[in-house]
């Protein structure tokens, strides 16, 4: 099995899917995409596969639809046995390969770690996760240890103008119109 150019896992990568079991005898693998449009995972190249704490670069040689999913051929994997060794490994990409967004659009990963404060200056905590609910995205905010309202976590809808007043990338801060007791 030949991987290209290894790099330390600490280099930021964005996980976009997972490799499944091997398919056929020529080194193909099933792919499970985490992207909104599953086929868009193939828009990004190279892919990085986590191998023992290192990101190993692989180029996508080919891909095709198979039943209700996808299969992929990675460069350097030519036999089933080599492909089998990558079963259940995560697929990541370089975040720099993502399309640039307008000033008022955000990737979820940009919001993680941002401080959340009310319009009155009350510190609600830090964004630790995001949830997709269908109608709108929701910020998962871990409250400060000494939260005056005894909250450990808050779920705040990401509704621009209504709830989200300002997202300041520079200051790593989100200002919200939200009742701290809720």
Curated annotation (Swiss-Prot):
One of its GO terms (cellular component) is ribosome. It is found in: Cytoplasm. GO terms for biological process: maturation of SSU-rRNA. InterPro entries: PRC-brl_dom, PRC_barrel-like_sf, RimM, RimM_N, RimM_N_sf, Transl_B-barrel_sf. Its main location: cytoplasm. Keywords: Chaperone, Cytoplasm, Ribosome biogenesis, rRNA processing. It comes from the Bacteria. PANTHER family: RIBOSOME MATURATION FACTOR RIMM (PTHR33692:SF1). An accessory protein needed during the final step in the assembly of 30S ribosomal subunit, possibly for assembly of the head region. Essential for efficient processing of 16S rRNA. May be needed both before and after RbfA during the maturation of 16S rRNA. It has affinity for free ribosomal 30S subunits but not for 70S ribosomes. The PRC barrel domain binds ribosomal protein uS19. Binds ribosomal protein uS19. This is Ribosome maturation factor RimM. It comes from Vibrio cholerae serotype O1 (strain ATCC 39315 / El Tor Inaba N16961).
């Amino acid at each position: 099995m030949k991987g290209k150019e290894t790099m330390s896992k600490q280099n930021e990568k964005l996980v976009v899917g997972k490799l499944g079991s091997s398919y056929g005898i020529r080194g193909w693998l099933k792919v499970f995409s985490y992207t909104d449009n599953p086929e868009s995972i193939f828009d990004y190249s190279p892919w990085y596969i986590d191998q023992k704490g290192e990101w190993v670069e692989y180029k996508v040689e080919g891909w095709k639809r198979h039943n209700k999913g996808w299969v992929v051929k990675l460069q350097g994997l030519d036999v089933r046995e080599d492909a089998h060794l990558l079963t259940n490994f995560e697929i990541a990409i370089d975040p720099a390969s993502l399309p640039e967004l307008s000033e008022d659009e955000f990737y979820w990963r940009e919001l993680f770690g941002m401080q959340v404060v009310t319009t009155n200056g009350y510190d609600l905590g830090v964004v630790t996760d995001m949830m997709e609910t269908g109608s709108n995205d929701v910020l998962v905010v871990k409250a400060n240890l000494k939260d005056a309202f005894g909250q450990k976590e808050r779920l705040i809808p990401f509704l621009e103008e209504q709830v989200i007043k300002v997202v300041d990338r520079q200051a790593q801060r989100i200002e919200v119109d939200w009742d701290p007791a809720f």
